[in-house]
Amino acid sequence: MILRFPEQLKNSWRRESEDFLGVVPESEQAKETLSLSQPASRCPSCGVPIKPWHNIPLISYVFLRGKCRACSTAISMQYPLVELLSGLATAFIVYQFGLSLMAGYCLIFTWVLISLTGIDFREQLLPDQITLPLLWLGLFANLSGIFVPLNEAVIGALGGYLSLWSVFWLFKLITGKEGMGYGDFKLLAALGAWMGWQMLPLIIILSTFVGALVGIVGLLMKTREKQVPMAFGPFLAMAGWIALIWGDKILGSYLSVFGL
């Protein structure tokens, strides 16, 4: 998903541009139909198809010692990290909520956020094809008030979008630069649709704090350049997941400090 879906989008945009301009594709690869299931997984370095028993999450990575069986090229650490994170998060959700409808929704929410995190980290892109269905699924879940009442979910979606939209234009008016992408607005709108408007301040504060901390540490350690933009989506996703699982407890603890 993280690697293939952006390539699928690029191929689609390329074909649309070629059709519009009347350009003939330069290679057979450009004509190849790419989907999430076809063609079968293959090494990005040598192109050799990966056998099913070499494609088992985590186990195959350890068995192959982190290298392609065909060309011995090192396999990106992103694969086992995503597999490990997905497995741990899935186990935690099932442990926390049991085999319930809420657990099912939480699992979908978790897997989508992991995918968006990986895509935005690699491509600085939050595809509408993922963020908008996530938003509508949140509203659908809250038709029956699984997480929050529907009116709070609708206000959360509107508030999530408009809050970052306002920050975007204020920053652009002051600096003449774009501080974030429209995908960030839509992701926060989706999070608001799932958890309601009450969780938006927590999500914004937590994501901004962690994002700023990571950015400062990166600059101090010289692992990133000052002028290179940093994806904000992963921090929104992380804050959103924390808010879904522990948001009520965090807000309760915060309010109790002030006797509210």
Feature-to-residue mapping (PLM):
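C-terminal ends of transmembrane helices
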Residues: 1-4, 65-70, 113-123, 166-178, ...
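Alpha-helical membrane-inserting segments
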Residues: 2, 89, 93, 97, ...
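Multi-pass membrane catalytic core of lipid/isoprenoid biosynthesis enzymes
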Residues: 47-106, 183-185, 189-190
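Functional transmembrane core segments of multi-pass inner-membrane proteins
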Residues: 102-210, 252-260
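Interfacial loop-to-transmembrane junctions
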Residues: 182-183, 217-242
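Conserved post-catalytic alpha-helical subdomain immediately downstream of the catalytic base
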Residues: 198-228
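C-terminal domain-closing interface element
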Residues: 238-260
